[in-house]
């Protein structure tokens, strides 16, 4: 989960572009409360690069916190921008 000024700053699109460039699979979506949620899967070094990127985000973002959890892989293919879930 990424907190701060992370919506309305092209966070999701930039995240997708970076993930595709890194060869990382997963997804990213806005949450109703203003945060962004993402899942990254791939080689550990590439996932680490994505998490490092999430701490900065795109130029207009102001990231205040990144919460990271290790979970069982879902064996995703590609990287998607998902719709915001209903509150």
Protein language model regions, located:
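Intrinsically disordered, low-complexity, mixed-charge
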Residues: 1-87
């Amino acid at each position: 989960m990424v907190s701060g000024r992370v919506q309305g700053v092209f966070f999701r699109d930039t995240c997708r572009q970076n993930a595709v460039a890194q060869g990382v699979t997963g997804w990213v979506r806005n949450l109703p409360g203003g945060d962004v949620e993402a899942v990254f899967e791939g080689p550990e070094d590439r996932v680490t690069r994505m998490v490092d990127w999430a701490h900065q985000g795109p130029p207009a973002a102001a990231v205040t916190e990144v919460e990271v959890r290790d979970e069982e892989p879902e064996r995703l293919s590609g990287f998607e921008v998902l719709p915001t879930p209903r509150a």
